[in-house]
Amino acid sequence: MSYNCCSRNFSSRSFGGYLYYPGSYPSSLVYSTALCSPSTCQLRSSLYRDCQKTCWEPASCQKSCYRPRTSILCCPCQTTCSGSLGFRSSSCRSQGYGSRCCYSLGNGSSGFRFLKYGGCGFPSLSYGSRFCYPNYLASGAWQSSCYRPICGSRFYQFTC
């Protein structure tokens, strides 16, 4: 499987397992070591574990993709987070290339944290989502109105 992002083609064979997010997911992932125009980022594409040259941006995003080392979630650009994400919009405000959001790590800690590269931790204080931080993505069900990826399911092709 291959897809185009940032005007380049990447193959899943080069990166091992992959994670697919359905188009209904309301937020965005940013996972890139190369800046690119949001218009060149492909929605509904697969993101690969350890991939260093992919990006996922909302259609309304007018900023460049960022350069995170690990896959992270980011809030919509130039706006507050959607209420559908499970927390008040005041909990997450766009701050240039960084966002301030609720987050929860696998060790049980939670709260507000500023994440680099425009990343926004997934709202999890009330919904119990977790990160395999600093590795990969969520390690358990995201109990929000969005979607519930489970390790070992067809959405996860690798072990968190």
Swiss-Prot record:
GO terms for cellular component: cytosol; intermediate filament. Pfam families: PMG (PF05287). The keyword Repeat applies. It comes from the Eukaryota. Residues 41-86 are annotated as: 4 X 10 AA approximate repeats. Sequence repeats lie at residues 41-50, 51-60, 61-70, 77-86. Keywords: Keratin, Repeat. In the hair cortex, hair keratin intermediate filaments are embedded in an interfilamentous matrix, consisting of hair keratin-associated proteins (KRTAP), which are essential for the formation of a rigid and resistant hair shaft through their extensive disulfide bond cross-linking with abundant cysteine residues of hair keratins. The matrix proteins include the high-sulfur and high-glycine-tyrosine keratins. Interacts with hair keratins. Belongs to the PMG family. This is Keratin-associated protein 13-4. The gene is KRTAP13-4.
